[in-house]
Swiss-Prot record:
The gene is nucS. It is an enzyme of class 3 (hydrolase). Its EC number is 3.1.-.-. The lineage of its organism: Bacteria, Bacillati, Actinomycetota, Actinomycetes, Mycobacteriales. GO terms for molecular function: DNA binding; single-stranded DNA endodeoxyribonuclease activity. This is Endonuclease NucS. Its main location: cytoplasm. NCBIfam families: PRK03298.1 (NF002876). Pfam families: NucS_C, NucS_N. It comes from Mycobacterium tuberculosis (strain ATCC 25618 / H37Rv). Keywords: Cytoplasm, DNA-binding, Endonuclease, Hydrolase, Nuclease. It is found in: Cytoplasm.
Amino acid sequence: MSRVRLVIAQCTVDYIGRLTAHLPSARRLLLFKADGSVSVHADDRAYKPLNWMSPPCWLTEESGGQAPVWVVENKAGEQLRITIEGIEHDSSHELGVDPGLVKDGVEAHLQALLAEHIQLLGEGYTLVRREYMTAIGPVDLLCSDERGGSVAVEIKRRGEIDGVEQLTRYLELLNRDSVLAPVKGVFAAQQIKPQARILATDRGIRCLTLDYDTMRGMDSGEYRLF
């Protein structure tokens, strides 16, 4: 079963790792998920956390000072240090087994076709994995480019701004993994709206228009005996 813990607390937050970052005292939502991820949220950033730690990570409590400090540490030794000044709400909830996001038929087929014909992304590209799982959901395709660099690909039937935002979240998360980083992004769709293309380009994400009919007609060796 999936258990999520919600805490609303007056707190300060310090990130200690490759960089350092400090969030001064404020009321915040702390979200602890069953996969081990921890995220810190404010009321003004929609779905985006102020800071977070991806799994695997571990939560311990230091109680030697004036206020308890919740320390979230990952395997790389990076830490989120959350100093708790006061707790207004603390609850845990069973969410059950989530069926996951079900892609429509065209998107699922586009993903399968692009995985099979990965050279459409560029010469020298190789497929690492389909549905590469992250703490916030699966990346459609994880690939390597001609230089061995990591590339995350998000595939849509219609490429809109929310798809670019989704890929941006994946990239922010994947680029915190020292094994994969740096990770580039490709936003692939049958049709990409101008606003989505502008946003993607501004964020350094490459756009790729997919011709579904042409891809369906491409030669496949999947069932070939010779």
